[in-house]
């Protein structure tokens, strides 16, 4: 689409993912064995024919920038368009950090102006879904809208986590509440917007002048423009997941191991592209038992794996058992280990006779809001020495060496 530019907001820290985002931005977190979260939004763009893309980064962007590079895996290494990493920078008027989602777009007006598009699509870089943005744009045009917000129904119990909208019979948005304590509906914004560029450009310029604004699309821009302009809700009935918590991240990964998963990463008509290492095929020894699991390239499995997701280059030693767990790339698990209900981040080394996820559940002594399930999380580049036992709902930070037992709920 020659008259469309996509801007992907990828600067989020993802604090609710705890140690998983201590070293990297949330969109760079691995998902589904071989992907990173941003791959799904980038793939949606190119599958929809959008090849002019800006990725707005901020928090710990190094790994994310390295992953995207010049965009070759997504066919974005091109002279006309392609992908551009847009990091915050100093100007004569502004400091270096983006001060909200709307401010991030405002500070990159010149990038969009260079393409002189009719439409701009604003997207989040950390959600799991497949969407043909052509359908969204066609709907936007049919409604003669100045802005369109993709939305879906959510359970009332979850509505306060979202931007919630009230619409009329034509799906025109007449009220918008950002994460309300008492939601008036269950129609939730997915953080996916289409705007007429000439319109939103002026709105952003005016918003930047307002010292009382938080410069956020959900809190400021959408509530303001619905008062006078044609802003519509686009109902989306496909799979969409915000994997913003430890539990939702773990659950969404394990959903992929079902015989018929709710989200299809194997769809030949809507491929998910990624930048991954060239590795040999996985090796599964004759003594191994593997059931309902995703096993990525370069894995060597000598133990038993069930209902788990293994990223590239994972090694599991003889006699070890891995159940209901997400194991990220280049993790080394020794012999005779037992691991259940765990998320183990990249480059972790686990010795022999280690037990993880055992015992009775206990509340987290680190952060009850972030760590509130039976899932134990091991941060990147840590070492768990042989014969260590770690309970349920435990946390091991990044770059740690663990040589003592942790009871359920404890952290190091």
Swiss-Prot record:
GO BP term (any one): glycogen biosynthetic process
Alphabetized InterPro entries for the sequence: ADP-Glc_PPase, ADP_Glu_pyroP_CS, GlgC_bac, GlmU/GlgC-like_hexapep, NTP_transferase_dom, Nucleotide-diphossugar_trans, Trimer_LpxA-like_sf
Gene3D superfamilies xref list: Hexapeptide repeat proteins, Spore Coat Polysaccharide Biosynthesis Protein SpsA, Chain A
Alphabetic keyword roster: ATP-binding, Carbohydrate metabolism, Glycogen biosynthesis, Glycogen metabolism, Nucleotide-binding, Nucleotidyltransferase, Transferase
Gene Ontology molecular function, alphabetical: ATP binding; glucose-1-phosphate adenylyltransferase activity
Catalytic function, reaction form: alpha-D-glucose 1-phosphate + ATP + H(+) = ADP-alpha-D-glucose + diphosphate
Species per Swiss-Prot/TrEMBL record: Thermosipho africanus (strain TCF52B)
Annotated EC: 2.7.7.27
Name of one Pfam family that matches: NTP_transferase
PANTHER family: GLUCOSE-1-PHOSPHATE ADENYLYLTRANSFERASE (PTHR43523:SF2), GLUCOSE-1-PHOSPHATE ADENYLYLTRANSFERASE-RELATED (PTHR43523)
Protein family according to the UniProt entry: Belongs to the bacterial/plant glucose-1-phosphate adenylyltransferase family.
Quaternary structure and partners: Homotetramer.
Name the record gives this protein: Glucose-1-phosphate adenylyltransferase
NCBIfam families per the UniProt record, alphabetical: glgC, PRK05293.1
Amino acids binding alpha-D-glucose 1-phosphate: 98, 163, 178-179, 189
Domain of life: Bacteria
Job of this protein: Involved in the biosynthesis of ADP-glucose, a building block required for the elongation reactions to produce glycogen. Catalyzes the reaction between ATP and alpha-D-glucose 1-phosphate (G1P) to produce pyrophosphate and ADP-Glc.
């Amino acid at each position: 689409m020659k008259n469309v530019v996509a801007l992907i907001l990828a600067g989020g820290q993802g604090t609710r993912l705890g140690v998983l985002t201590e070293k990297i931005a949330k969109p760079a977190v691995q998902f589904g064995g071989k992907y990173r979260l941003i791959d799904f939004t980038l793939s949606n763009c190119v599958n929809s024919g959008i090849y002019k893309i800006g990725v707005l980064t901020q928090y710990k962007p190094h790994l994310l920038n390295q992953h995207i590079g010049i965009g070759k895996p997504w066919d974005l290494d091109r002279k006309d368009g392609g992908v551009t990493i847009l990091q915050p920078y100093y100007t004569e008027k502004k400091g270096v950090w983006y001060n909200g989602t709307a401010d991030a777009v405002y500070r990159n007006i010149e990038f969009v102006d260079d393409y002189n598009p009719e439409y701009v699509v604003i997207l989040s870089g950390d959600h799991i879904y497949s969407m043909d943005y052509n359908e969204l744009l066609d709907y936007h045009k049919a409604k003669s809208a100045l802005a369109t917000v993709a939305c879906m129904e959510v359970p009332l119990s979850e509505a306060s986590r979202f931007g919630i909208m009230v619409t009329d019979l034509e799906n025109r948005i007449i009220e918008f509440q950002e994460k309300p304590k008492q939601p008036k509906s269950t129609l939730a914004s997915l953080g996916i917007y289409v705007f007429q560029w000439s319109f939103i450009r002026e709105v952003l310029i005016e918003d930047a002048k307002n010292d009382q604004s938080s410069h956020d699309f959900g809190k400021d821009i959408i509530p303001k423009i619905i008062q006078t302009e044609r802003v519509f809700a686009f109902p989306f009935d496909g799979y969409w997941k915000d994997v913003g918590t430890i539990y939702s991240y773990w659950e969404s990964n394990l959903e992929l191991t079902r015989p018929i998963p709710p989200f299809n990463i194997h769809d030949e008509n809507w491929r998910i592209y990624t930048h991954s290492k060239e590795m040999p095929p996985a090796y599964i020894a004759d003594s191994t038992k593997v059931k309902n699991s995703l096993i990525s390239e370069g894995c060597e499995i000598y133990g038993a794996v069930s209902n788990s997701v293994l990223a590239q280059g994972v090694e599991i030693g003889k006699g070890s058992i891995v159940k209901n767990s997400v194991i990220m790339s280049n993790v080394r698990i020794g012999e005779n280990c037992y691991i259940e209900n765990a998320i183990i981040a990249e480059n972790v080394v686990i010795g022999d006779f280690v037990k993880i996820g055992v015992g009775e559940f206990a509340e987290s002594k680190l952060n009850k809001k972030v760590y509130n399930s039976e899932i134990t999380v091991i941060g990147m580049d840590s070492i768990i020495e042989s014969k260590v036992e770690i309970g349920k709902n435990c946390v091991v930070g990044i770059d740690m060496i663990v040589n003592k037992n942790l009871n359920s709920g404890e952290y190091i």
